[in-house]
From Swiss-Prot:
This is Fibrinogen-binding protein. Residues 50-63, 99-119, 141-151, 195-220, 802-814 have a biased composition (Basic and acidic residues). Promotes bacterial attachment to both soluble and immobilized forms of fibrinogen in a dose-dependent manner. This binding occurs through the beta-chain of human fibrinogen. Could contribute to the initiation of foreign-body infection by allowing bacteria to adhere to biomaterial surfaces that have become coated with host proteins after implantation. Is important in the pathogenesis of central venous catheter (CVC)-associated infection model. Residues 120-140, 160-170 have a biased composition (Polar residues). The gene is fbe. GO terms for biological process: cell adhesion.
Amino acid sequence: MINKKNNLLTKKKPIANKSNKYAIRKFTVGTASIVIGATLLFGLGHNEAKAEENSVQDVKDSNTDDELSDSNDQSSDEEKNDVINNNQSINTDDNNQIIKKEETNNYDGIEKRSEDRTESTTNVDENEATFLQKTPQDNTHLTEEEVKESSSVESSNSSIDTAQQPSHTTINREESVQTSDNVEDSHVSDFANSKIKESNTESGKEENTIEQPNKVKEDSTTSQPSGYTNIDEKISNQDELLNLPINEYENKARPLSTTSAQPSIKRVTVNQLAAEQGSNVNHLIKVTDQSITEGYDDSEGVIKAHDAENLIYDVTFEVDDKVKSGDTMTVDIDKNTVPSDLTDSFTIPKIKDNSGEIIATGTYDNKNKQITYTFTDYVDKYENIKAHLKLTSYIDKSKVPNNNTKLDVEYKTALSSVNKTITVEYQRPNENRTANLQSMFTNIDTKNHTVEQTIYINPLRYSAKETNVNISGNGDEGSTIIDDSTIIKVYKVGDNQNLPDSNRIYDYSEYEDVTNDDYAQLGNNNDVNINFGNIDSPYIIKVISKYDPNKDDYTTIQQTVTMQTTINEYTGEFRTASYDNTIAFSTSSGQGQGDLPPEKTYKIGDYVWEDVDKDGIQNTNDNEKPLSNVLVTLTYPDGTSKSVRTDEDGKYQFDGLKNGLTYKITFETPEGYTPTLKHSGTNPALDSEGNSVWVTINGQDDMTIDSGFYQTPKYSLGNYVWYDTNKDGIQGDDEKGISGVKVTLKDENGNIISTTTTDENGKYQFDNLNSGNYIVHFDKPSGMTQTTTDSGDDDEQDADGEEVHVTITDHDDFSIDNGYYDDESDSDSDSDSDSDSDSDSDSDSDSDSDSDSDSDSDSDSDSDSDSDSDSDSDSDSDSDSDSDSDSDSDSDSDSDSDSDSDSDSDSDSDSDSDSDSDSDSDSDSDSDSDSDSDSDSDSDSDSDSDSDSDSDSDSDSDSDSDSDSDSDSDSDSDSDSDSDSDSDSDSDSDSDSDSDSDSDSDSDSDSDSDSVSDSDSDSDSDSGSDSDSDSDSDSDNDSDLGNSSDKSTKDKLPDTGANEDYGSKGTLLGTLFAGLGALLLGKRRKNRKNKN
């Protein structure tokens, strides 16, 4: 049997009275592309033609002059020569046969003629219609379903004729060439021409030449055509013309794919929501590129809706690997557009890869202007899916009825949208004096094989005399059937009603139905005539006629409407304006019988293995094994790609690849592995191709594309942090490690990889490291100093410093060490002092004191003493003491002392005391003493002091001192002392003292004293001391001394209570207690302040 394919084709032959034939509007029904054209035809009265035929004189009547003026004004703007190339490719899903058709119409030598009719043809394929276009399969792979424009489209051509000067028109046409390559391409270049022509007086028919015959309008100049019935504007509502029913012609399905001349029907019904399965995964769809372009000239921003200009939406997107079979995504077209211009049902393109595998199928929701795609198990088999979608859509004339409407159109895939601003432009009526009309095909029903034509008669509201309308199905390249089954309805437009510029009526009930059988008569030549008579209102004619798609010579649907009005009732002069509306189908069959064989496709594979011996050749080691789950990606020539993973045997495979094309295969390196050597040995079936390779199909499968990997070795880094006691920067045998030191490992960019601390032996280690560059950082331990770095010649024994840059190349590195030693001095002293000193001191002392004293005392004393003493003291003491005193005393004493003492003592004391005292003393002492002291003091001191003091003192001192001291002090002090000493001592003493004191003392004293004294002393002392003192003291002194005494007594010690110096001794004891009380009082006050 012979399976016919409906393919795009334009029939080419010399045609009389035709010029500027071109495709205007296209849509796709199944594999049928439909383009609608409109041809305007203007006729002239016989008298004008005859005058021109018989004479060359330029004679015109006044009416004709007016006519030419109007006509030539239009012609200057609209007359053009047009060349159209229509390239259309159709895909048949059922058998995967791709048919390509290219059409080129060239129009030359257009001259003036008597009746110039320009036709537009539209070619229709009846294969599956899709939005998603594919480029011709000339070894170019796209993950793209280019949209086959699943809409009927329409445009118009118009020309106006006046009969004044003879002319002829020559049209040269090139036959279109039909091919049956594997192509899924569908696009059309359509436009409209509007011309005004003068009538020819002669014409002839030649090959590639069209001339207007002189007889065309001979019998239509002096009288109206026979069979017309005159009617006036007053037309009452009548029943449907011809009283014939018609099947519903709206919302019908159209063929999607076919292998015979009588196609089967697949359809998508609009207003039916997609049955969603799985989850909506719009959030997992990544749009990488999208754009909106105009069908003709994208730079002008104008959509010529009556010229079949469409909007093209291109989007490229990636599908996340998380998407599963049954999940859905959405694509939204603009709310002011429709996928099809003439049909109410259409197919939604499947999203396929370049090998033909279906990624997703779609359904359309007309209410929401949304396509819902459901993913197949393709997404479960492949990864890194990239797709390209190309959709075409047309202006929805129900949404945009008016000319020059500005729109901001928006298209959206998943969550990403794109916008474009356009202006919608509609054609204007064709007029020739009072003859004016506008016509378009507005619907095609491919199931019932009917077309609907909407005609505006007198839309410009002229006063048109003797108006006649002829509707003819006699197209030169195809015809409709005008017979008893044709439905014609006539509607009158009221004075306050407007006709939509879109030439599309959606609700005829708004207009007055004036259909009348009496004024419409069927002709004898597949036509019908309607006589309107004299009118000045617009009318709408709706014509529903049939076509026969099974006729052997059937190629187009063509229907012509002509309006004729009388200009001069006396001469019979008239004017005509015509439209030819055309939908062109072309059929083609495969070579011979049956379907065209599918194009042969090929495979690429095959193996990924673990190359244990790293030689780049398979099977050279018994331990080598396949690697599973390795990601392998195939990239098509257009940049789209898909990925699979190797199975448990290390195998992978890509199918459906085209011969002669070059593909890229990429292997992802598994974690923990390194690519082995590539192109080793002489056998390409056993070597490794590395990470990526380009493969060209040369008429056979290529199952030699393999890749090998070996496990990447891991390395360690360390090693040691030690206590460098000799500070030489080199590890010594007796030097120990330092534990707890923080060590940080970073990459070469400073990003932290890991941290650790040294163990009890000072060791640390980082493992599982690849070859590369690293940074090791040591945190310096508190109280220690970085030792010398890079000392000596042994890198494993020296210190490398705080931060070390390390390069690991196929080996461990245990030479990264560092050393530290203790700080020499760390002194932190905080002292705030304000002193004013004026002193005059001459001191020479040599003190030798040997005392060993251990005192442990805990005393809490609260005393209230009243002492009245008069003492006279004469003492000679020799003291040898060794004392070690650690005292914390708190004294609370309240003493009132009045003493007068006279003491004469000679004491020899050798004491060994161990004292630990804790005393709390609060004393209030009132002392009245009278002492007379004569002392001579020489002081020479050599002191070694280690003190920890924090002193905050405010002292006012008047001293003059001359001191000779040798002091070696190592102090680390942090001390904060606040001493508040308030001492009020009123001393009135009269003492006579003669003392000779020889003291040899070696004392270690740690004291904290707070002393406030106001004393008036006159002394001269001679003292020799050598003391080693560690003291923390706060002192606030106000002293005034001016005395010089030197006494020596040797009197015998008196009996207790019987000595004549008793008064003096009492005074001395009272003074001693008073001083002690003052000291303890100051200490207590200081302690209280510290506690506060």
